[in-house]
Amino acid sequence: MELKTKISAEDGKQDLVITREFEIPLELLFTAFIEPEIVEQWMGTKVLKLESARHGSYQFETTDPMGNKHRFNGTIHEYEPDHKITRTFEMENTSYPVQLEFLTFEQLTNNTSKLTMHIVYKSVNDRNNMLKLPFAQGINMAHNRLQEVINKIKK
């Protein structure tokens, strides 16, 4: 099965680019990243904090199948509604260093939009270690859920 979410990772570079086109109006796609109730539904995580503003911060908590809790946090550096979010992302209590994420939201038509995530890692090795995880499948599944959640909201 072809993944709708595309990941481009050039050899020898410490970044990657994730793109996905959605059958969602731009405003709803952006909302899916800033409204805690919607984020929880498509990310499958509990939102402990989400300050969707410049210099805001966020913290999410996920429980794995064995009951272990994992937390993720970051700071929002740029925030332009319906256009851009620049933020850090950190997996707490892991060996993975903080990464920098540039999220760009683009209107394609009145009912379709595109998300581009440019993620920069501390090193090429850090990026490659992330790609060894079931990263592509996981983000594709999350984006599929995002589409499903917004489809329910649109009705």
Feature-to-residue mapping (PLM):
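Hydrophobic ligand-binding cavity/cleft-lining segments
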Residues: 1-46
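Intrinsic-disorder/low-complexity, polar/charged segments enriched in Ser/Thr/Lys/Arg/Asp/Glu/Gln
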Residues: 13-19, 57, 71, 84, ...
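Short beta-edge strand/loop motif at the mouth of beta-sheet-based domains
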Residues: 17-18, 36-71, 82
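Hydrophobic/aromatic beta-strand elements that line small-molecule binding cavities or substrate pockets
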Residues: 20, 48, 72-78, 89, ...
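A short, structured loop/turn motif at beta-sheet edges
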Residues: 26, 77-83, 104-114
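Hydrophobic pocket/interface hotspot
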Residues: 29-30, 39, 58-60, 76, ...
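Beta-strand/loop substructures that line and gate deep hydrophobic ligand-binding cavities in soluble
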Residues: 93-137
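Short, highly charged C-terminal tails/helix-capping segments
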Residues: 151-155
